[in-house]
Regions:
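Sec/SRP-type N-terminal targeting helices
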Residues: 42-46, 59, 93-123, 307-308, ...
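Bacterial Sec-pathway N-terminal export signals of envelope proteins
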Residues: 19-70, 87, 91-93, 97-100, ...
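Bacterial N-terminal signal peptides that target proteins for export
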Residues: 1-9, 17
């Protein structure tokens, strides 16, 4: 029983470690799954496998020819009567033709392999880019929800000030926040009742008594006017924060819809159900570029697309050599075997003995136009592949420089907005504390809160852009 328990515990530990490793390195896991199951990459690999099958075809001799002949009436020969003949002939191309043909097929298979690597690298870049987009959307939802909590806190503070007429202390407003947590709409009954009661109280307090009441002091009218203005300002502040809340709630809803779309886009690269869950890391490591700039620039020719055109150029060079050698004669070697029947009365020593005749044949390639056209075709295709290689390399250099610029820009923005977000967060906390004690303008609190939200979004965008730029550099250099 103890052994069974040990095995169960061991299995659970292995499973937990497996899932933890997947959680820590989920992107690597998704890249592996994409390489295994993406139909586009599998199609390119199948094409490469099919191209490999052409190599033994190209390096093989043509099939030998077998000829059978039967004489309906035996032919009288000196050594007897010939009744049948059998001949075998094998044609051999000119020296080096098969080697050139094999080289062409091998280089074309290599080009297919480089095409497969290109598709795989492009898939990896798309998976990384889509993964980073998912991460950005998830983080933006988290940031928006945290800022929504801040706005709800500001709403409670504004509602408390509106109820107390702006005269309550911070402790008093803290107690009022608990009782007014449900007052989130300017059209709610509680707020209307409080505003109506406040207005009626102010109105009754400002009306002079007609029966023996003391006379109104000269400053009471100004005080009532300032209290009315303060009440209006507090109500406007409450409406402002509720407008911001509604805008942010709408933005969160939009981000949630975007998250569904991002998952569909990501899952299609893995060829799995589009609604499958995707797990992302809690944070993206800000990985530096792996090599220095000069080494990266020198590695651009290692891009599989460049190597593919190089292989095509070499294949067409071998094809040109093959076309040249195909214009030379083909040599045939064979054997003719004649069946001889004995003839009565023939005293020859060869009477009835079969005859064997070695044969040699030679083709005459006198129609030269087709061989010339084959050479011209191979030469033009070789030049086209060389020009395509140059064009791809030029585009890689431009795209690499653009990716490097994007990386440097994103790296600067990460440092900038990380610091700016910290400063803005401290400013928001200080302004909220100051507003609670009646020392800060509510508009300034909202403005700084919006700036904090903007900095946090930009910081996430910068981190995603930086990692996407690194993935782009890796894709361009073919690593």
């Amino acid at each position: 029983m103890r052994q069974i328990i040990k095995y169960i515990v061991l299995i659970i530990m292995v499973v937990v470690i497996h899932y933890e490793s997947n959680g820590q390195d989920s992107l690597s896991y998704y890249l592996e799954q994409a390489a295994l199951y993406n139909p586009g990459v599998k199609s390119r690999y199948i094409e490469y496998s099919a191209a490999l099958e052409k190599v033994p075809q190209a390096s093989s001799l043509t099939d030998p020819e077998l000829q059978l002949g039967y004489l309906l009436k035996p032919m009288m020969l000196l050594g007897g009567n010939q009744v049948a003949s059998v001949s075998v002939m094998q044609m051999f191309p000119w020296f080096g033709t098969l080697k050139a043909s094999k080289d062409e097929a091998s280089k074309m298979a290599l080009a297919k392999f480089e095409s497969f690597l290109t598709a795989k690298n492009e898939l990896f870049y798309n998976v990384k880019s889509s993964y980073y987009k998912l991460y950005r959307t998830i983080k933006e939802i988290e940031i928006a929800e945290k800022n929504l909590e801040i706005l709800h806190t500001l709403e409670k503070l504004a509602l408390t000030k509106f109820r107390t007429g702006g005269t309550g202390s911070s402790q008093g407003m803290g107690g009022q926040m608990q009782s007014g947590t449900n007052m989130s709409s300017p059209g709610s009954t509680g707020m209307n009742n409080s505003s109506m009661s406040g207005q009626s109280n102010m109105g009754s307090g400002s009306m002079p008594s007609s029966q023996g009441s003391p006379a109104m002091s000269p400053g009471s009218g100004a005080m009532n006017g300032s209290m009315g203005a303060t009440g209006k300002d507090d109500m406007v502040n409450l409406l402002r924060v509720q407008i911001e809340i509604h805008d942010l709630e709408n933005r969160i809803a939009l981000l949630r819809d975007q998250l569904v779309t991002d998952k569909v886009s990501f899952n299609r690269f893995l060829n799995r159900p589009l609604s499958a869950d995707v797990f992302t890391a809690d944070s993206l490591s800000q990985t530096p570029i792996p090599l220095n700039i000069h080494e990266l620039t020198d590695s651009l020719p290692n891009n599989p697309m460049v190597k593919m055109y190089q292989a095509e150029s070499e294949a067409n060079r071998a094809k040109y050599d093959m076309a040249t050698k195909m214009g030379y004669p083909m040599l045939g070697v064979g054997l003719n075997y004649m069946l001889i029947q004995k003839r009565d009365g023939n005293t020859s020593m060869m009477n009835g003995k079969d005859m064997k005749m070695p044969m040699v044949s030679l083709s005459l390639p006198i129609y030269r136009k087709k061989y010339k056209a084959m050479r011209n075709e191979a030469g033009l295709l070789r030049d086209a592949a060389s020009q395509s290689e140059i064009d791809v390399l030029n585009n890689l250099q431009v795209n690499f420089q653009q990716a490097l610029q994007n990386f440097n820009d994103a790296d600067r923005r990460v440092k900038l907005y990380t610091g700016q977000a910290l400063l803005a967060d401290k400013s928001v906390q200080l302004l909220i504390t100051s507003y609670s004690s009646g020392g800060a303008d509510f508009v300034e609190v909202l403005r700084m809160q919006q700036q904090l939200l903007d900095y946090q979004f930009k910081q996430v965008d910068a981190v995603v852009d930086k990692n996407t730029s690194i993935a782009r550099v890796v894709y361009l250099t073919g690593n």
